[in-house]
Swiss-Prot record:
Residues 150-162 are annotated as: Active core. Belongs to the cathelicidin family. Proteolytically cleaved by proteinase PRTN3 into antibacterial peptide LL-37. Proteolytically cleaved by cathepsin CTSG and neutrophil elastase ELANE. Antimicrobial protein that is an integral component of the innate immune system. Binds to bacterial lipopolysaccharides (LPS). Acts via neutrophil N-formyl peptide receptors to enhance the release of CXCL2. Postsecretory processing generates multiple cathelicidin antimicrobial peptides with various lengths which act as a topical antimicrobial defense in sweat on skin. The unprocessed precursor form, cathelicidin antimicrobial peptide, inhibits the growth of Gram-negative E.coli and E.aerogenes with efficiencies comparable to that of the mature peptide LL-37 (in vitro). InterPro entries: Cathelicidin-like (IPR001894), Cathelicidin_CS (IPR018216), Cathlecidin_C (IPR022746), Cystatin_sf (IPR046350). Its main location: secreted. Residues 1-30 form the signal peptide. It holds the Pfam family CAP18_C. One of its GO terms (molecular function) is lipopolysaccharide binding. It comes from the Eukaryota. Residues 31-131 form a propeptide. This is Cathelicidin antimicrobial peptide. Keywords: Antibiotic, Antimicrobial, Cleavage on pair of basic residues, Disulfide bond, Immunity, Innate immunity, Secreted, Signal.
């Protein structure tokens, strides 16, 4: 009498289920984005919703904060984007576009999720008001500070030497 254990189809089904069990975790892992990939997707969304003429591209990504392992939990992000030469209507990736000389720089902050299936982000960007010093300004200011400090040191030396000179009593 033949039992189900001896059935070749049961062995095949067991093998199929085993393989599915091994493949499914890999499929889930493949849906988790890296921190930078999630930020790049958020920038794509910013470009789609922007009313500006040109695309924006990642200029600087702040270090990744310590995060929990749940890809569905919103993760805090902060980064800087800069205007490119590519028009917003182009189908070109912003990463393939050069930065526009004197292009608008925006500071962006918010949250992203790393779960590719959810693909959610909440980002707001404002014009970056930080001044980027030109080398000429840097050297001029450094020279002024050094000059002031040098004058202060010379004055302190003069004051010290005046106190060393013996005073004559009249």
């Amino acid at each position: 009498m033949k039992t189900q254990r001896d059935s070749p189809s049961l062995g095949r089904w067991s093998l199929v289920l085993l393989l599915l069990g091994l493949v499914m975790p890999l499929a889930i892992v493949a849906q988790v984005l890296s921190y930078q990939e999630a930020v790049l997707r958020a920038i794509d969304g910013i470009n789609q919703r922007s009313s500006d003429a040109n695309l924006y591209r990642l200029l600087d990504l702040d270090p990744r904060p310590t995060m929990d392992g749940d890809p569905d939990t919103p993760k805090p992000v902060s980064f800087t984007v800069k205007e490119t030469v590519c028009p917003r209507t182009t189908q070109q990736s912003p990463e393939d576009c050069d930065f526009k000389k004197d292009g608008l720089v925006k500071r962006c902050m918010g949250t992203v999720t790393l779960n590719q299936a959810r693909d959610s982000f909440d980002i707001s960007c404002d014009k970056d008001n930080r001044r980027f010093a030109l080398p000429g300004n840097f050297f001029r200011k450094a020279r002024e500070k050094i000059g002031k400090e040098f004058k202060r040191i010379v004055q302190r030396i003069k004051d010290f030497l005046q106190h060393l000179v013996p005073r004559t009593e009249a």
